[in-house]
């Protein structure tokens, strides 16, 4: 499929056009028509009904939903993607409420600041959806994408969306969406690209505290940061004056290795080695909440169960339904930029960290190898990292 850039899609939306938004192939893997309520024209919903044929919904911010008393459709939401449907509505000025014109009227009234809860009949023929406050950075769904796109065009936080179906009633995917795009001359973007766009556009960390931290390996300055969209807490250890070409270690949290000195992995040994190096040569350790390469502590323990049955660290993740590595280094890049650092010497054996930082504008001037001894317990793990994951060990 050929995707357009986010800026061109925003321009199209602001001109009243409809675009196609495609989600992750591991999620619904479908395309929705998306329009911004404030900019859409009288033909938008008619086009969706005739050409896309899916359910026409109206994503809105939580503020709009609360102001208009749009309560959840059900108390116990069992939708597999957690889509926040409210009770369906028609505006009181409609008749049956089902015509494209009347659904357009209802959608427009959702963003009218003079509208009140009593102005909408329930149930109706338009289905509001409530977006997460943090948008696609909290949930990578079409609901959040529509509201984020509206905000990025400068409009009120509301949109209209509709799934695209093929002529035979199946959901349009892949080349079907490409043909639909070409037939109707529409812009097409991915939610993943929208996520990256927002990450580059908006600050994602907040500085919270700085203290002196004496350790077994020397005394460091410890900075505390909070990720604004996930509420994750990140700590950074520094030694010496902060400068360009700083020696930097990105360390993914490993409770079992860092705290309990597990020999299943080499994480604890790498952290200690890096602290000794930074204490001697100066630099920075960014300690990231990425337990189990991003799958979390309990899932990592589940992966260990599979490893005890003969899986390796990669195939265990895949068997649990995860990619081999879910980590993203945007937060790390944001922290480096907070310190005005764009060029670093990276303490790492993992090539994916190099690429992960480069895509966010960080230049890797030099790689510093982290050498730790192998144990009888982590031999297979180390071999898998080297052979399957390309680690330089």
Curated annotation (Swiss-Prot):
InterPro entries: DHBP_synth_RibB-like_a/b_dom (IPR017945), DHBP_synthase_RibB (IPR000422), GTP_cyclohydro_II (IPR032677), RibA (IPR000926), RibA-like_sf (IPR036144), Riboflavin_synth_RibBA (IPR016299)
Entries under Gene3D superfamilies matching the protein: DHBP synthase, GTP cyclohydrolase II
Swiss-Prot/TrEMBL site (Essential for DHBP synthase activity) positions: 125, 163
Entry binding sites for D-ribulose 5-phosphate: 27-28, 32, 139-143, 163
Chain residue ranges for the region called GTP cyclohydrolase II: 201-393
Enzyme Commission number(s): 4.1.99.12, 3.5.4.25
Region named DHBP synthase: 1-200
Chain positions recorded as Zn(2+) binding sites: 254, 265, 267
Catalytic activity: D-ribulose 5-phosphate = (2S)-2-hydroxy-3-oxobutyl phosphate + formate + H(+); GTP + 4 H2O = 2,5-diamino-6-hydroxy-4-(5-phosphoribosylamino)-pyrimidine + formate + 2 phosphate + 3 H(+)
Residue positions binding GTP: 249-253, 270, 291-293, 313, 348, 353
Pfam families: DHBP_synthase (PF00926), GTP_cyclohydro2 (PF00925)
Any Gene Ontology biological process: riboflavin biosynthetic process
Known pathway: Cofactor biosynthesis; riboflavin biosynthesis; 2-hydroxy-3-oxobutyl phosphate from D-ribulose 5-phosphate: step 1/1; Cofactor biosynthesis; riboflavin biosynthesis; 5-amino-6-(D-ribitylamino)uracil from GTP: step 1/4
The organism's place on the tree of life at top rank: Bacteria
Active site, per annotation: 325, 327
Residues that, per the record, bind Mg(2+) 1: 28
Binding-site residues for Mg(2+) 2, renumbered to this chain: 28, 142
GO terms for cellular component: cytosol
Molecular function as annotated in GO: 3,4-dihydroxy-2-butanone-4-phosphate synthase activity; GTP binding; GTP cyclohydrolase II activity; magnesium ion binding; manganese ion binding; zinc ion binding
Role according to the record: Catalyzes the conversion of D-ribulose 5-phosphate to formate and 3,4-dihydroxy-2-butanone 4-phosphate.
Similarity comment: In the N-terminal section; belongs to the DHBP synthase family.
NCBIfam families: PRK00393.1 (NF001591), ribA (TIGR00505), ribB (TIGR00506)
PANTHER family: 3,4-DIHYDROXY-2-BUTANONE 4-PHOSPHATE SYNTHASE (PTHR21327:SF18), GTP CYCLOHYDROLASE II-RELATED (PTHR21327)
HAMAP family linked to this entry: RibA, RibB, RibBA
Official protein name in the record: Riboflavin biosynthesis protein RibBA
Native source organism of the sequence: Staphylococcus aureus (strain MRSA252)
Source taxonomy: Bacteria, Bacillati, Bacillota, Bacilli, Bacillales
